[in-house]
């Protein structure tokens, strides 16, 4: 009798176990899918093509932007501004932001096919940079710089007029110097004798022909990007180089500030700047860059893969964060930024429309 009772209890327990298993377990026809605890954010790469002279401030804007946008990596691609534009207009490379050291390149080369709006957001000026180890560093001034550059053994340079705005602006400054210092041999002595760059005059306008510069590379050196010359100054490969003031400040270079009449910094002398222009290569032909105050421009190209994020990057650039960074890096911001074309609604409150 006891055995029968025990057997019955065991059978009951087994039945309960089987029933419980059937309620909570799986059968051969069932599969179990784990419930995800979190979905990883999709990694986004925001591509920014920008002038080499913007490298310093843009690295800081990049850090601020990434800190506020989880999952976004900003890829900075510096180059001469003309080359930056050509990557988009001629090579079809996508960029989410395009920032040029010459704002005029955007309406001239990108609007309307590759962009339908742009902003002017910062200013600059041309300076002559050097180091304490440069020849005659203890003698050079804003009054005698062109005489120092002409001395035997002095090595100096500027960037390529065909790829970099600093490059086509440098000979403009030298040509403007002839009128300011009342010496009509400055350009020929410094540039003409050491390269294939020539100047012609018609109706009071001087055209600098620089499509095929061919510098002698002993006295005069020309490099694709102006920032490359910084390294040469620091390494002692050059004594002097033409740069933007912001680049000199960011790289702790010595520099000579020139009169506003010739340094392309002031709208008060815009008419005087316009008396010089540089002819440079464009595709199979040439184009003319007319002297004007140095103003930076930015846009989100039509080819952008992440246009909304591009607009947010521009918003940070022209807002309080970007203004502080630019000011600290020796690149005075334009406040408010100037707006042209179909400026996005998200930027309207930070922009003064110009046309």
UniProtKB/Swiss-Prot annotation:
Pfam families: SBP_bac_11
Molecular function GO labels: molybdate ion binding; tungstate binding
InterPro entries per the UniProt record, alphabetical: ABC_trnspt_W-bd_WtpA, ModA/WtpA
Keywords, ordered alphabetically: Signal
Record keyword Signal present: yes
Disulfide bonds: none
Signal sequence coordinates: 1-22
Gene3D superfamilies: Periplasmic binding protein-like II
GO BP of this protein: molybdate ion transport
Record-linked PANTHER family: MOLYBDATE-BINDING PERIPLASMIC PROTEIN, MOLYBDATE_TUNGSTATE-BINDING PROTEIN WTPA
UniProt-listed NCBIfam families: PRK04168.1 (NF003196), tungstate_WtpA (TIGR03730)
Protein family (similarity comment): Belongs to the bacterial solute-binding protein 1 family. WtpA subfamily.
Protein name, per record: Uncharacterized solute-binding protein Memar_1880
Organism: Methanoculleus marisnigri (strain ATCC 35101 / DSM 1498 / JR1)
